[in-house]
Amino acid sequence: MKQQARRLLNKNEKGLLPREVYVLSVVAFFVALGYGMIIPAIPLFAKTFQVNNAQIGAIISAFALARFAMGLPAGKLIDLFGERRVQTTGLLIVAISTFASGLANSYWQLLTYRALGGIGSVMFSVSASSLLMRSVDDSIRGRAQSTFNGGFLIGAIAGPAVGGILSVISLRVPFFVYAFTLVCAAFVTSFFLSTKRLGKSIKNKQDPSDRILLAEALKSYPYVAAMAISFLSNWVLFGLRNSILPLFAKEHLGASNSALGLGFTIAAIVQGIALVYVGKISDFRGRRFALMIGSFTLLSGVATIIISSHWWYYFVAMVFFGIGGAFEGTAASSVVGDLFGGKGGRVIALFQMAGDFGNIISPVLLGWLVDAHSYRPAFIATAAVFSLTLLLSAKMPETRKLNK
């Protein structure tokens, strides 16, 4: 039985992915590389306008809120004009707004341009996910998603290092270089994803008769569960790991600034290594199995922090977070791809919005819990809420189809 499943799921014995997957992964690399460049520069550049920390935080939030608010409209645009046009347009919007950010002469200009960048960003991310889902079948979907996520991860690792070097020249330079990488990404999209290059195996626009309506998608338990898992995973990875864990590790575990940075590097490297195998596991063992591994691993990371008493617990937790993030990100997206095959821009957009909402709300709520009750109660509350993902995963029917 296992041999039959393996043969059906791996019709292409070499596991070769279609060209679209590699092109989208290159585009993801350019986007993440440039975004990583400006991450260390944004707060420093904003500070030059003599603003307070809350106003600096508003610049970060404006980008995220614009992404969230424009998610469903971006999905509608994809339904009307197709992924390739929307992706190219979105990348150019981010490129122009980023270049303008580098030229900003006031705080309000910078805030406005970053918000516009969020609109273009969600146009890119939703269209890329939709095209990726439509380009592959269930037999290789996990590997395709891992490859795409890997492009993002490599860019995200390299970006801050490059941005730090560029910031020495000027805090405006990273914005200009990021704009250039986005133009490169737009060129790759428009040229290498054109019908002339790829043929007509994937239509530029979806057939309206095949499109999945949002109301119909919301009746699917696996879809709703995948959204909940994405929300809760981002709660852990962005709210806990990225926001309050570094403060806890420094104040209570005695970790140095260099140790904090090393922890994030370790998590990124571990996640990159895990992505090599996660896609195959998801394809051969199923999405439900991969989601359960991811949920258990992330929960183990939170538990490690709860019982921590020394700085090395921080590194152990970051390893768990790297592995768990690879499983959850790949498997949850694969579930949505299995169910709908990218047929419905707003369906894909709402799934991404669930993750974005976790990014937005979790740092605020966890920060409030820390202020009101201290760190460990915030960690325990996170573990209690996130444990729901184990139940959601266990109840989820397998969405990967053996008869593709």
What are these regions (language model features)?
Residues 69-105, 282-288:
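Conserved MFS/SLC helix-loop-helix module at the cytosolic interface between two early adjacent transmembrane helices
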Residues 148-190:
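Helix-loop-helix hairpin linking two adjacent transmembrane segments in secondary transporters
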Residues 4-18, 195-226:
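Juxtamembrane intracellular "pre-TM" segments in multi-pass secondary transporters
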Residues 64-72, 156-157, 268-276, 359-360:
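Residue-level signature of mid-helix packing/kink "hotspots" within the transmembrane helices
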Residues 97, 108-116, 301, 312-320:
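Paired small-residue
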Residues 41-53, 243-258:
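Short amphipathic helix-loop junctions that connect adjacent transmembrane helices
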Residues 113-154, 339-341:
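Cytoplasmic helix-loop-helix junction between adjacent transmembrane helices
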Residues 50, 82, 103-109, 254, ...:
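Helix-breaking motifs and short loop linkers at transmembrane-helix boundaries and internal kinks
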